[in-house]
Design a protein with these regions (language model features):
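Basic-flanked hydrophobic alpha-helices used for secretion and membrane insertion
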Residues: 312-326, 330-555
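Short helix-loop junctions at transmembrane helix boundaries
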Residues: 38-48, 52, 121-153, 210-227, ...
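Alpha-helical membrane-protein architecture signal
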Residues: 1, 5, 9, 103, ...
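Short cytosolic juxtamembrane segments of multi-pass membrane proteins
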Residues: 2-3, 178-192, 570-571, 661-669
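Hydrophobic alpha-helical transmembrane segments of multi-pass inner-membrane transport and secretion
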Residues: 16-44, 53-89, 109-123, 237, ...
Length: 669
């Protein structure tokens, strides 16, 4: 037993260049999992206003973190096993049976597990309070500065990673028991035979990528964008692997046929080296590209949502207080405003910066210049479904200080989203309006700003049109199903008081037994201060997870880069020794190395940038579901994220290039 233990410890020590980054990665994965598990059980976080939403997101993030850790540790462990197989083959040739090799590998796995858990849990316990403070800071809450250790999170971490390491160990043992001694000795050099140019796979990858890009730039409906995004992600991942594995080989073959390019010293070596083992290189490059894209998508979207939270909140709630009164007669509107003013005064405030108008809401599918109102409740995403708000022109004039006059059958129009081609709109069989003006501004309702559908606002001569259209809509509802509607008085205002007083007024109006001296069907009240915490919880939770997963994805990409270049360096060293013996000097070797490493490193970054550029229209539409419709702001955030990530990428390139050169130049024997 001691012999196997010493062999395992010696193997880790001799291969410290490979094992130290692997153990650090395992420890960081343990730390991240412990932190997310500890926060998922944080009662203070879930109890604060808006914190429960972040809590639910962190619970989901904990599961995703465990799955990613399992997949990624399996992947990185394959680099270690590849480099150790020759050593184990030698043990087998010298008389150690496969059972003995299995014991050595089991001890190695156990050692790595113990070291990773000690450092990972230690770091997790140390940094969990910092993560908790960050989470509370994001949702603008007050955290207790009391240090604590989460026993359940530590136990869960021990169990989850014990299962992961057990599966890794079983996979390694499977490779050993199903291999022959000679295969173990030669496994480090397996794949040396250059793959043939697979034009079918390369063309298939190009077609799949083209289809994904086409979907990304042509999808218009936000709901369709979600489904398209999932399909595009699958296509892009598959296409990226095909193009980096098969397409890169095809490219190398094309470059080799270009004699003017290929028969230059630096190009000759780099192209021949790349083509010699491009199948393995291609898979690594594709993994780096996909992880880089995940970093950019995760960070840019979550940062955009969190930093734009105030803008989103103001779109959803245009004033401090929003009221929607259903079925309020036109003649009772002044009395309603008086009653609301009296309630506000009771709480030491008065309405100001008022936004008010009445509307009748219609819905239907636009076909040509006709609104088919019978299809208003259809779930067919292929239809051009619209909401239509019909507003008296007098309300618009009062809001904007204009004096637009309309005759019977005339309307002014404002469009949220897509416009309307013709100058006349037919509202089912009710009648039609001739559009005389297209207005450039209007403050839409908060509920409409939260919807995914395009909206038409029609400003008509007087209130009687609202009543007639509302009656017609309800007749269709009775015939085809759906909810009956009422004319709505939309009354919003700011308050010259603190949030506590605003909340008191909100709760009295929404839930209190307030008596109004007139009749209406229903009163719905919304308060920006009340939902501010929920917005922070949602967008803050996504931002927090974005930071965690962005960091994990960056770590994964960096580690794959490192392992790939180190393993390539050891494999290339013998070939560069041959080149040195036939007369190449160190300067020529360094130039050839730089050419190869530049290609290896920056192809994934460039491809990730292209993926992100084509994904941008889809991401814009998906963020629209979260009320973030500022594409310019998203573009700025995305460019900043790309610039920062590219700078980090270049720094990793500089470090890896030196390590690779030291190995192939023989300075690290």
């Amino acid at each position: 037993m001691k012999l196997y233990f010493r062999l395992a410890a010696g193997g880790i020590r001799r291969n410290s260049r490979l094992y130290v980054p692997y153990i650090m990665t395992c420890s960081l994965m343990v730390m991240m999992y412990y932190i997310t598990d500890a926060l998922s059980g944080d009662e203070m976080l879930s109890a604060m206003r808006g914190g429960y939403i972040m809590h639910e997101l962190i619970v989901i993030g904990k599961v995703v973190m465990a799955l990613f850790a399992a997949i990624f540790l399996f992947y990185t462990n394959s680099f270690l096993i590849k480099s150790r197989m020759r050593e184990f083959g030698l043990y087998n040739i010298l008389g150690m049976g496969k059972n003995g090799i299995a014991r050595v590998m089991t001890w190695e796995t156990l050692m790595v597990y113990v070291i990773s858990m000690v450092f990972g849990l230690g770091a997790g316990i140390l940094f969990s309070k910092l993560a908790e403070l960050l989470a509370f800071k994001i949702v603008q809450g007050d955290a207790a500065y009391q240090f604590s250790v989460s026993g359940p999170a530590a136990a869960a971490s021990l169990i989850v990673f014990a299962v992961i390491f057990l599966l890794i160990c079983l996979n390694v043992l499977r490779q050993v028991f199903f291999s022959k001694p000679v295969e173990l000795l030669r496994s480090e050099n397996s794949g040396e035979k250059p793959p043939k140019a697979n034009w079918f796979a390369a063309v298939l990858g190009a077609l799949m990528l083209g289809l994904a890009y086409f979907m990304a730039v042509t999808i218009e409906e936000p709901l369709s964008a979600i489904l398209a995004f999932m399909a595009a992600v699958i296509l892009v991942i598959a296409a990226t692997y095909l193009l980096f594995v098969a397409g890169s080989v095809v490219l190398c073959r094309v470059l080799q046929k270009n004699k003017g390019y290929y028969y230059k010293t630096n190009h000759f070596i780099s192209v021949s080296q790349m083509s010699y083992r491009m199948r393995k290189n291609g898979a690594g490059l594709a993994s780096i590209c996909i992880l880089s894209t995940m970093v950019l998508v995760t960070l840019s979207t979550t940062i955009c949502l969190y930093t734009g939270e105030e803008q989103i909140l103001r779109q959803r709630y245009p004033r401090d207080m929003v009221t929607m009164t259903y079925g309020l007669p036109e003649e009772d509107i002044p009395a309603f405003r008086e009653s609301v003013g009296a309630l506000a005064e009771k709480h030491g405030a008065s309405p100001e910066n008022v936004l008010a108008y009445s509307y009748a809401e219609l819905s239907g599918a636009v076909i040509g210049n006709r609104l088919d109102m019978a299809r208003g409740n259809s779930d067919d995403v292929s239809l051009d479904l619209r909401s239509v708000y019909v507003v008296p022109i007098a309300d618009y004039n009062a809001l904007y200080g204009t004096d637009i006059q309309l005759a019977d059958g005339e309307a002014a129009a404002y469009f949220k989203g897509k416009g309307f081609g013709g100058d006349e709109i037919q509202l089912d069989d009710w009648g039609s309006y001739r559009i005389t003006q297209r207005l450039g501004e209007f403050t839409i309702t908060g509920t409409d700003s939260a919807t995914i559908y395009d909206t038409i606002y029609l400003f008509v001569k007087d209130w009687s049109d609202l009543e007639s259209l509302n009656d017609y809509q309800n007749r269709l509802t009775d015939e085809y199903g759906g909810m009956r509607s009422n004319i709505v008085y939309y009354y919003c205002f700011d308050l010259d008081c603190g949030e506590d007083s605003q909340l008191d007024l909100y709760y009295e109006m929404e839930y209190g037994d307030v008596e109004f001296p007139f009749h209406f069907e229903r009163l719905k009240t919304e308060c920006r201060a009340r939902d501010h915490e929920e917005f922070l919880g949602l967008y803050g939770g996504l931002f927090f997870l974005g930071i965690l997963f962005g960091g994990v994805f960056i770590l994964a990409a960096v580690l794959i880069m490192y392992y790939k270049q180190i393993s390539e360096g050891f494999n290339d060293r013998a070939r560069f020794d041959i080149l040195r013996k036939v007369g190449m000097n160190d300067r020529e070797i360094r130039r050839a190395v730089n050419s190869q490493v530049l290609t290896v490193f920056f192809a994934p970054l460039i491809a990730a940038g292209i993926h992100m550029a084509f994904a941008f229209p889809l991401l814009t539409k998906i963020l629209g579901l979260f009320n973030m419709r500022d594409a310019g702001f998203l573009a700025i955030v995305t460019l900043i994220c790309f610039a920062v990530f590219a700078a980090l990428y270049v720094a990793v390139y500089a470090l890896t290039s030196r390590s690779y050169y030291r190995i192939v130049s023989g300075n690290n024997r």
